[in-house]
Amino acid sequence: MEKSEATVKTSIARFGIVLLVLFLSAPALAGTRDDCITKCKEAGNFIKTQGISAAIKEINNKNGRFVWNDGVSYVFLMNMKARMLAHPHKPELLKPATLIDATDVDGKAFFREFVVKAEKGKGWSKYMWPVPGMEITKPKHTFIYRVPDTDYFVGAGFYVMKPGVFY
């Protein structure tokens, strides 16, 4: 009977730890989500006030205002035909006329999903993507924001490194 009580207490303690980790990570996730939304809206405003050429230059800048979190978080710019116009870490994405049919390692056509979200004005998308500066692919949550009255949208996201750890 004592062993059974110890097992129950251990299980309760483990459950408590899991709840604590989830509780403590919620503000970090909220901050990360909020940062992505804020940066996308700032980029949209930059496009509207400074023009598309200046925005492409600034968004492509690895050390610019639209790259943060040690370079892991960044804004990218696309048009409604799924053509990448600016990306600070993957200039090779600028070459194709469209990325509409490109997929992640799991076969998800996430660029197509980006366009659908942009058609609605905004939205979140989840897919697998390489982490900048690392040789790993992790789940990424990206906020898509259509720049009002244009054929452009921007995106910014964060990676889920492991349960409760967002980057």
Task: Map each language-model feature to its residues.
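N-terminal membrane-sensor/transducer module of prokaryotic signaling receptors
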Residues: 2-9, 17, 29-167
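N-terminal signal peptide c-region/cleavage motif recognized by signal peptidases
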Residues: 25-26
